[in-house]
Design a protein with these regions (language model features):
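Pre-recognition alpha-helix immediately N-terminal to the DNA-recognition helix
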Residues: 22-27
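Short beta-strand "wing" residues that participate in macromolecule-binding interfaces
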Residues: 71
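Short capping segments at the starts of secondary-structure elements
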Residues: 17-19, 30-36
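Glycine-centered, phosphate/nucleic-acid-interacting loop/turn motifs that mediate DNA/RNA or nucleotide
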Residues: 67
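Short, Lys/Arg-enriched N-terminal segment that forms or immediately precedes the first helix
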Residues: 2-14
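Short, hydrophobic-biased segments on the C-terminal half of alpha helices
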Residues: 60-61
């Protein structure tokens, strides 16, 4: 998905399309494994040095609450 497609998806789900949420969603969309929050953080921090683990956890929670992703138990 493109940046604008992801932004539209987030907005249509009632979320603000922040760069953090877009990056996390894009990562999950392109990596069809079941990564941990730490794996997502490790992959994105080089590209987005201002990201923190808290940012990743909050983005994941927002995406789950909007039913855009599902947790794996």
């Amino acid at each position: 998905m493109t940046f604008s497609e992801i932004a539209g998806l987030l907005k249509s789900s009632g979320l603000r399309a922040t760069p953090q949420r877009i990056a996390v969603y894009e990562y999950l969309d392109t990596h069809r494994t079941h990564p941990t929050a730490d794996e997502i953080f490790a992959s994105l921090v080089a590209q987005y040095p201002s990201f923190s683990r808290t940012t990743i956890y909050n983005s994941i929670r927002a995406l789950e609450d909007a039913a855009l992703i599902q947790p794996v138990m």
